[in-house]
Amino acid sequence: SKPGEGWIVEDECIVRVQRAGHLYTKASFKDFDFSFEWKITPGCNSGVKYRVADYSGEVLGPEYQLVDDAKRKYSPGSKSATSSLYAIKGASAKKKMKPIGEFNHSRILAKGNHLEHWLNGEKVLQIEIGSKEWHELHATSKFKTRPNFATKKGRIMLQDHGGKVWFRNL
């Protein structure tokens, strides 16, 4: 399939309906405040990556994870659960996610080395790139061989990683 072919516009939403490849912004951003609404189907795995750029020869970016935590048996604070900074830091275990099939509101704030993830009006994750906490978590992550990970100006990406996902009000 051609890039973007499995994404459609339906009821004012961008919807991933079949394997399609990721969707990227044309512009690149380093400092931004990005809000969006999303919902997923049971078992779905998706995400919003940001500061997507070439990091040591691979196109990567930090990810605000969107996933069916229960179906995948992720604890709420897991580094793989919804709202986590995927593979680096889990979101608050007290996060309030709406049931599968209902829209959630998320926000990503990136300013310099400061990153925040929000879910349904509550800040659920905060980290400073370069801090002691960052160095400890980054050193044990799959991104440990990329010392400048998450620091570059880059594109925002809607991830195609399996399952039907809706995005609106981006």
Question: Each predicted region: which residue ranges?
Answer:
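Carbohydrate-interacting regions of secretory-pathway proteins
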Residues: S1-N169
